[in-house]
Amino acid sequence: MLNNNYIALIMEINNCEGLSFLTWDMFDSPDLPNSGYKFMEREPVILLDNIIKRYRIIIKVVLGYVSKPYADKLRLVRSNSHRVGKAVKIRCVGTKKRLTLVRGLVQQGVHRIGVSNDYV
């Protein structure tokens, strides 16, 4: 039987796996712990981590992966990219910071970017 400290250590290692600044739990569905690590696509998260490393900006991930019950609660359509872990909603206040983030996303080859006053 595994020790609780060992399990916590493994979860902590997984939480940062492949990332420099972000952690996988930032992308968890609010109702399902560790879902960000299990269900998020690796590519968008790693791209975002590279942008943060390059431009030294701080972001707040508002929405990453969402489970079916949580998506139903938010009334997200069945084909919503958050349901399959391919989308990230980021709170980004300030024109300069927002433009820096969008520029970084475009330079990394992202084609689908939604921008509003406070979110990317």
Regions found by a protein language model. Give the residues of each.
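Extracytoplasmic cell-surface/polysaccharide-interacting catalytic and binding patches
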Residues: 1-54
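Long, low-complexity, intrinsically disordered polar/charged segments
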Residues: 3, 10, 24-25, 31, ...
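Helix N-cap and loop-to-helix transition residues
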Residues: 23, 41, 67, 94-97
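N-terminal start-of-chain detector that recognizes signal peptides
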Residues: 32-34, 59-65, 93-97
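Generic structural signal for short, solvent-exposed loop/turn connectors between secondary structure elements
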Residues: 36-37, 56, 75-77, 92-94, ...
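Extended, low-complexity, intrinsically disordered C-terminal regulatory tails
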Residues: 45-76
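Catalytic cores and adjacent binding grooves of peptidoglycan-active enzymes
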Residues: 80-86, 91-120
